[in-house]
From Swiss-Prot:
HAMAP family: PSII_PsbJ (MF_01305). GO terms for cellular component: photosystem II reaction center; plasma membrane-derived thylakoid membrane. It is a single-pass membrane protein. PSII is composed of 1 copy each of membrane proteins PsbA, PsbB, PsbC, PsbD, PsbE, PsbF, PsbH, PsbI, PsbJ, PsbK, PsbL, PsbM, PsbT, PsbX, PsbY, PsbZ, Psb30/Ycf12, peripheral proteins PsbO, CyanoQ (PsbQ), PsbU, PsbV and a large number of cofactors. It forms dimeric complexes. This is Photosystem II reaction center protein J. Signal peptide: none annotated. It comes from Synechococcus sp. (strain WH7803).
């Protein structure tokens, strides 16, 4: 490979600055944007567990309980 840096014609932002430091600080790497991804994933996981719990509850009570 050549030592020449690519100009990244597809619009990507390089992950390192010319002096070798990361382009985005580690503190803010996972919390950029409107809502942190970990918060969205936690809420989604809790919603899935709630719905699965409703199915189990419904299988022991009501119409399908035998």
């Amino acid at each position: 490979m050549s030592g020449k840096k690519s100009g990244l014609p597809d619009g990507r932002i390089p992950d390192r600055l010319p002096d070798g430091r990361p382009a985005v600080a580690w503190r803010s790497r996972w919390t950029e944007g409107t809502l942190p991804l970990w918060l969205v994933a936690t809420a989604g996981g809790m919603a899935v567990l709630f719905v699965v719990g409703l199915f189990f509850y419904g299988s022991y009570t009501g119409v399908g309980s035998a």
